[in-house]
């Protein structure tokens, strides 16, 4: 079995990422629960370099292509090879749960993946060869686990600082010629590192879909763009703050679900939880685990985090990565700081520093909410006081000057009635 040691630049110097190639078939004798996170399949560009390029993409921007759906279907077949005998031939709603970010491309990727993992064996009513499988999602603004742009002012400030960091300046110097080249070709006088993803994204999408590049583009230039993109992408989760606020929420959810399974509160049947998400989701999760891989996650690749139960009830955590599209190669990481074998308890102890106690508060969101809440309460209090004052004044106006009527009433009788009429 091949053991590899890769030296990569991480958050604080050199990080040794240790991994080994492993067989595709899982060890189902001890396997108890699996979390998988995959990136959606091939898609159209999220943004365009040139407005006229929209005609190249009839599906629209940021949408799953037919090729992407096929990639996910094949990934589902690959997962079936690894877990099929353990999961069974038919989808079991008590054993399997699929969650997606709220994008067409990830929702459709999940459906295509499940079609590959659980192909229909028998026709349903009406003779349809179809096995419908539910895919769950939540709205983007509330999805702090899978939505890469969930509002978090603290993380945004931290990321802005990264663009000015020594590491970022080193990238600018290393790729000065490429940045100058694209600044000229795209008419961008102040070419920023953060714009490189859009350049890579468009060129890569065109390459994947056999669309002709502009005349000034060629394979050797693209190779440098690819290198530039991968180095810039490593800035995204370069600090503990970014890992805690961008990757920690998902890792914490995964850890607590493992703990619930181990304690029995998740139920005996629960086996498999899948997240249909993005390259940034996988990258954030890996970085939070302490793994700084030098190539950004590709289309229809997946991370597998397994929990194994030993005879003595000890739970072990193993992390696998299928990091190539449509290639069977699977690697297993050694988790930095968590001795091999890595127990669930040790993993939690090592990584709890990345579990936000109050994500909204740490992001600086609760201050705004509390301010709005106080304003609303203040308005209600002022309105109530004003209303009571007006009622009191009105009541006083109705206290009538007293005078005698037909000699039968004395000076204390009200003009329009007594207090019972109020």
Curated annotation (Swiss-Prot):
S-S bridge residues: 152-363, 205-302, 338-342
Keyword Glycoprotein in annotation: yes
Signal peptide: 1-13
Cross-referenced Gene3D superfamilies: Phosphoglycerate mutase-like
Protein keywords: Disulfide bond, Glycoprotein, Hydrolase, Signal
PROSITE patterns, sorted: HIS_ACID_PHOSPHAT_1, HIS_ACID_PHOSPHAT_2
Entry's Gene Ontology molecular function annotations: acid phosphatase activity; phosphatase activity
List of catalytic residues: 40, 279
Annotated catalysed reactions: a phosphate monoester + H2O = an alcohol + phosphate
EC number: 3.1.3.2
Domain of life where this protein originates: Eukaryota
Keyword Glycoprotein: yes
CDD domains (UniProt xref): HP_HAP_like (cd07061)
Carbohydrate attachment residues: 104, 210, 218, 312, 323
Family: Belongs to the histidine acid phosphatase family.
Official protein name in the record: Putative acid phosphatase 5
Phylogenetic classification of the source organism: Eukaryota, Metazoa, Ecdysozoa, Nematoda, Chromadorea
Gene that this sequence comes from: pho-5
């Amino acid at each position: 079995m091949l053991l590899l040691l890769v030296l990569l630049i991480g958050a604080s110097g050199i990080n040794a990422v240790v991994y080994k190639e492993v067989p595709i078939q899982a060890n189902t004798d001890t396997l108890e629960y699996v979390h998988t996170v995959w990136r959606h399949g091939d898609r159209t560009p999220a943004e365009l370099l040139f407005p006229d390029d929209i005609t190249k993409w009839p599906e629209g921007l940021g949408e799953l292509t037919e090729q992407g759906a096929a990639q996910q279907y094949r990934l589902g077949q690959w997962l079936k090879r690894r877990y099929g005998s353990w999961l069974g031939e038919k989808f079991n709603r008590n054993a399997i749960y699929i969650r997606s970010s709220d994008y067409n491309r990830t929702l459709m990727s999940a459906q295509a993946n499940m079609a590959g993992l659980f192909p229909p064996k028998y026709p349903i009513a009406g003779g349809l060869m179809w096995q419908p499988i539910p895919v769950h999602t939540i709205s983007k603004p509330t999805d702090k686990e899978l939505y890469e742009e969930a509002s978090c002012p603290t993380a945004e400030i931290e990321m802005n600082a990264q663009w000015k960091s020594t590491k970022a300046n080193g990238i600018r110097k290393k790729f000065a010629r490429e940045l100058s080249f694209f600044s000229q070709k795209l008419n961008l006088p102040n070419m920023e590192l953060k714009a490189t993803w859009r350049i890579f994204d468009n060129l890569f999408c065109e390459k994947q879909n056999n669309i002709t590049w502009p005349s000034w583009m060629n394979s050797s230039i693209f190779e440098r763009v690819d290198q530039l993109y991968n180095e810039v992408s490593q800035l995204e989760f370069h600090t503990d703050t970014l890992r805690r606020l961008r990757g920690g929420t998902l890792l914490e959810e995964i850890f607590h679900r493992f703990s619930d399974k181990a304690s029995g509160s998740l139920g005996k049947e629960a086996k498999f939880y899948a997240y249909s998400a993005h390259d940034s989701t996988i990258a954030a999760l890996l970085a939070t685990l302490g793994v700084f891989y030098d190539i950004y996650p590709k289309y229809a690749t997946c991370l597998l985090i397994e929990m194994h139960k030993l005879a003595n009830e000890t739970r072990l955590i193993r992390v696998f990565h299928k990091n190539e599209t449509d290639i069977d190669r699977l690697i297993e990481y050694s988790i930095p700081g968590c001795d091999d074998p890595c127990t669930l308890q040790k993993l939690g102890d090592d990584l709890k520093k990345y579990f936000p106690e109050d994500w909204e508060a740490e992001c600086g969101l609760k201050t705004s909410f509390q301010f709005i809440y106080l304003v609303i309460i203040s308005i209600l209090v002022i309105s109530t006081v004003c209303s009571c004052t007006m009622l009191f004044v009105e009541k006083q106006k109705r206290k009538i000057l007293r005078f005698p009527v037909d000699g039968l009433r004395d000076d204390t009788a009200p003009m329009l009635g007594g207090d019972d009429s109020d």
